[in-house]
């Protein structure tokens, strides 16, 4: 007979009698003979006390000595744009399902682990990454973990904090020399915590005060970018667990996120705390080896694989790579833009400098070798494969499998290269609908977010202190292949610098569109910046000559492209203003928000000034309607 597992929770007061005999806490003819280890019960109760009744659910299997423990991780602390970029539902918990031996618990076999979101059926790549992380964590813990060991650890912990125990003697010894410092690094144990029984709120505070250093998330109701339109958006605000909270928003310290939480409240609470520590910083670690990424400008928004060859092979064979078919179906215009940027960088005379990262693509005919290898760059072969990537317009008009077959016939490396272009993008890009910034005069407008949670948190802290404004950043399209993967970096006095740095080192911005349009057109041998009058004439000419192509064209139809970004910048004393040329030496104080693309020498209105109240109002309108819905 096939016995199906039954879920149990405190609300299950009714139901048919046949299923009740399998439920946790109910004695039945089959379940009566099964022994449930008391440490398992204690750990389950600890989860309920520290989190909530709904944070854990249990499923027993009748006569089988197995039990599934579902731990519900609340991820509402993630910002809206982060959860969207990571393809997770921030309104729904991530479920960690661990299968233990019912009678042996920690003395039994190592538990199997599943990670899922019930409503997130496809493309849950974050779940695969988290499953791998928690699997490694459990394997390490299981080497020394047992029911007796856990009980001993808890007894030691409790005796340490008894009024007659070690902590009292330790404090007395300290008082001979000096008073206990009132420092965040040494939380003070109040006498009230050492005497009598605490109330529930105080007890929970006491628990948190006694933890090892680790990361956890709170969920204050704060808007995504500090703008008022959305009451649902949450602020990522990591803190050291058990220590007095630091400034209003402290930056994430990713090194702490691999610290092992205490076993004081059992293994289930420990693994939940570890998952909470790791989730906000998944983008900072390789999805395969779990080693921290090393980037010139820090981590980026989306999780990715590192450049180690073993990781690249595993990434390919595990199928974690973003499916090109899905991306073309859901964001064809974005894929079109990514391919255009890759082509511009590859065809640049400066490709040896700016075409970074170079693709790491596994050979489909020999999965043990790399067809494209950063250590052995072959730009000609790469160009041939890129030329064989069919237009995204064609891909949307027929069967994707048939189009893939056609590409494979043209060049077997074309489709793997397309997959790499999509999966290596570490920024969140969304094509804006009709409610876009009309004064930019282009249909190719994108929401562009590249800052990881830690940088966005630091940005918000600085914004509360100093305020912010908007300014344009102009850079030739050949540079954006790298910017989307490495971030907007301070290129002054480096090999990446294309223009002069007359006003010092930093990221160059301008409130005036004509200045940024000038920078965006420079590249591919063009090193003279057009004057504002020339840009105005070009803009007027492009908008009076009858257009052969519709302004509402969905896809890019030209390889002659100009682009500029609209950034939000902190208005602190670090921002150096030299007339209409601004220099920000602090990369954490600049975050990209929007991206605009123009074809065939087209430019937008050269007279736009982001400090104009009407322009600012329009920017705020689009942010309010786009950031929160995308």
From Swiss-Prot:
Ribonucleoprotein keyword on record: no
SUPFAM superfamilies given in the database record: ADP-ribosylation
Name of the top EC class for this enzyme: transferase
Post-translational modification: Auto-mono-ADP-ribosylated.
Keywords: ADP-ribosylation, Glycosyltransferase, NAD, Nucleotidyltransferase, Transferase
Sites of ADP-ribosylcysteine modification: 237
Gene Ontology cellular component list: endoplasmic reticulum tubular network; nuclear envelope
Gene3D superfamilies tied to this protein: 3.90.228.10
CDD domains: ADP_ribosyl
Pfam families xref list: PARP
Family stated for the protein in its record: Belongs to the ARTD/PARP family.
Protein name per its UniProtKB record: Protein mono-ADP-ribosyltransferase PARP6
């Amino acid at each position: 007979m096939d016995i199906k597992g039954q879920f149990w929770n405190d609300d299950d007061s009714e139901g048919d009698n046949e299923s009740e005999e399998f439920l946790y806490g109910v004695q039945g003819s089959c379940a009566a003979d099964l022994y449930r280890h008391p440490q398992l019960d204690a750990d389950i109760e600890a989860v309920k006390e520290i989190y909530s009744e709904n944070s854990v659910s249990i499923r027993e299997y009748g006569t089988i000595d197995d039990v599934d423990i579902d731990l519900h991780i609340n991820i509402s602390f993630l910002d809206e744009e982060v959860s969207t970029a990571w393809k997770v539902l921030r309104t729904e918990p991530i479920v960690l399902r661990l299968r233990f031996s019912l009678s042996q618990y920690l003395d039994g076999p190592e538990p199997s682990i599943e990670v899922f979101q019930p409503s997130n059926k496809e493309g849950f790549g974050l779940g695969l990454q988290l499953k791998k992380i928690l699997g490694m964590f459990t394997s390490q813990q299981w080497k020394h973990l047992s029911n007796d060991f856990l009980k001993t650890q808890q007894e030691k912990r409790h005796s340490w904090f008894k009024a007659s125990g070690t902590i009292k003697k330790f404090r007395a010894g300290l008082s001979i020399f000096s008073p206990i410092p009132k420092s965040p690094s040494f939380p003070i144990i109040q006498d009230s915590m050492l005497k009598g029984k605490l109330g529930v709120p105080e007890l929970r505070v006491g628990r948190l005060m006694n933890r090892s250093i680790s990361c956890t998330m709170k969920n204050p109701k704060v808007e995504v970018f500090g703008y008022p339109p959305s009451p649902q958006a949450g602020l990522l605000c990591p803190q050291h667990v058990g220590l007095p909270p630091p400034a209003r928003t402290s930056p994430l310290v990713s090194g702490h996120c691999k610290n092992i939480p205490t076993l004081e409240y059992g293994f289930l609470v420990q693994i939940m705390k570890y998952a909470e520590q790791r989730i906000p910083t998944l983008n900072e670690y390789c999805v395969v080896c779990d080693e921290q990424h090393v980037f010139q400008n820090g981590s980026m928004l989306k999780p990715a694989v590192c450049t180690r060859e073993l990781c690249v092979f595993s990434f390919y064979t595990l199928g974690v790579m973003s499916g090109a078919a899905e991306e073309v179906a859901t964001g064809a215009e974005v894929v079109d833009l990514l391919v255009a940027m890759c082509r511009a960088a590859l065809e640049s005379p400066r490709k040896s400098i700016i075409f970074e990262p170079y693709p790491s693509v596994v050979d489909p005919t020999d999965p043990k070798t790399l067809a494209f290898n950063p250590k052995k760059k072959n730009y000609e072969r790469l160009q041939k494969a890129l030329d064989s990537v069919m237009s995204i317009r064609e891909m949307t008009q027929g069967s994707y499998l048939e189009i893939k077959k056609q590409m494979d016939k043209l060049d077997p490396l074309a489709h793997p290269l397309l997959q790499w272009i999509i999966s290596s993008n570490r920024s969140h890009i969304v094509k804006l609908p009709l409610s876009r910034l009309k004064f930019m005069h282009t249909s190719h407008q994108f929401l562009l977010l590249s800052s990881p949670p830690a940088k966005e948190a630091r940005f918000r802290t600085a914004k509360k202190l100093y305020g912010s404004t908007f300014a344009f950043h102009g850079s030739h399209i050949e540079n954006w292949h790298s910017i989307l993967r490495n971030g907007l970096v301070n290129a002054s006095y480096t090999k990446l610098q294309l223009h002069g740095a007359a006003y010092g080192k930093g990221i160059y911005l301008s409130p005036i569109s004509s200045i940024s349009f000038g920078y965006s057109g420079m590249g591919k041998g063009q090193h003279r910046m057009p004057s504002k009058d020339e840009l105005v004439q070009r803009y007027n000419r492009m908008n009076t000559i009858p257009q052969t192509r519709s302004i509402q064209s969905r896809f890019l139809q030209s390889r002659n492209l100009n682009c500029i970004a609209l950034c939000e910048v902190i208005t602190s004393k670090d921002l150096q203003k030299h007339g209409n040329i601004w220099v920000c030496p602090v990369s954490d104080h600049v975050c990209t928000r929007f991206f605009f693309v123009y074809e065939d020498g087209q430019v937008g209105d050269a007279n736009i000034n982001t400090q104009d109240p009407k322009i600012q109002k329009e920017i705020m309108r689009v942010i309010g309607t786009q950031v929160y819905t995308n």
